[in-house]
Amino acid sequence: MKNAYHICLSAGSEVCCRDEEDYLYYFNSLALAIAHTESSLMADSVMSNHIHECIRTARLVELIKRQRYTYTRYFNAKYLRRGSLFMRHPFVIVLDG
């Protein structure tokens, strides 16, 4: 059963998207993760160091892992960095009612 979630991915003090190409890659990686997990995006907002998303999915963990891995791999290669971009545990709230 698909549930709706508010997801917040925080990068702490790191800037998630430094230029327009980063934003485009982020949105494309999000679209691919949504398509792969048969989810639907209801709303999103990309801030300088964190991202908010409202998503309806039955495969929440897979969606978040796929999205974080794809974008972090791109970001690390582009900016010659290593390690996680986002904090280990995303903020997730089930939206019901």
Q: Where do the model's predicted regions map?
A:
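Short catalytic/metal-binding and nucleic-acid-binding patches
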Residues: 1-97
